[in-house]
């Protein structure tokens, strides 16, 4: 489990029944960063515009610098900087114990990153990582990966809509097929 800005534990079980788009970054990830929070906010907005208003999609960004991105630091970040209102629960920023985060991100999502290297000029150190978004269905199954810092929002919206339709139309034995299916294997890009 990881922690939200409010210090509350967030587990994969909390996301059950929700479609979730995971991303990975850190607060000091700016100019030359492969996937900054600003980039994620733009993707979130574009995907939101491409989806029907009633589509249940939660965005979760996991910090790759949990030693510096504490819950207190996440809480100081104004919601507007994340492209949301103060009461919008649809984008969670998570942090946690550095080792737990490494296990969760590497073991659970296959995202590997370096520890921040402290530069000599006093600026925050950079974390090296490959940008990635991961779409997880309401059963906790990874259904698609987008290995780019700026994925096509129409592609994500299409995939989310396919999952919504798939879940709505599956019953009995078809439901078992739904649970075992992986979007990136079943649907062409």
Q: What is the predicted role of each segment?
A:
Residues 10-40, 59-60:
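Short active-site neighborhood of thiol/selenol oxidoreductases, capturing the structured segment around
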Residues 3, 92-96, 114:
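Short acidic-hydrophobic, aromatic-tinged amphipathic segments that line or gate anion-handling sites
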Residues 1-10:
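N-terminal signal-anchor transmembrane helix
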Residues 37-104:
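Structural microenvironment flanking redox-active thiols in thiol-disulfide oxidoreductases
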Residues 19, 33, 44-51, 78-85, ...:
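Sec/Tat-exported extracytoplasmic proteins
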Residues 116-189:
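Thiol-/selenol-based redox modules, centered on thioredoxin-like
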Residues 89-91, 102, 109-115, 128-134:
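Structural micro-motif
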């Amino acid at each position: 489990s990881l922690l939200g800005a409010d210090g509350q534990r967030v587990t994969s079980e909390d996301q059950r029944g929700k479609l979730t788009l995971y991303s990975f970054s850190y607060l000091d990830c700016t100019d030359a960063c492969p996937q900054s929070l600003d980039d994620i906010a733009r993707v979130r907005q574009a995907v939101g515009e491409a989806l029907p208003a009633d589509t249940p999609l939660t965005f979760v960004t996991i910090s790759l610098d949990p030693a510096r991105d504490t819950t207190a630091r996440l809480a100081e970040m104004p919601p507007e900087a994340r492209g949301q209102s103060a009461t919008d629960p649809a984008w969670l920023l998570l942090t946690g114990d550095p080792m737990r985060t490494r296990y969760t991100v590497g073991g659970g999502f296959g995202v590997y990153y370096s520890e921040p290297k402290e530069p000599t000029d006093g600026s925050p150190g950079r974390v090296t990582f490959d940008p990635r978004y991961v779409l997880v269905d309401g059963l906790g199954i990874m259904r698609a990966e987008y290995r780019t810092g700026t994925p096509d929002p129409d592609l994500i919206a299409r995939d989310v809509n396919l999952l919504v339709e798939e879940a709505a139309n599956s019953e009995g034995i078809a439901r078992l097929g739904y649970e075992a299916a992986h979007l990136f294997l079943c649907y062409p890009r």
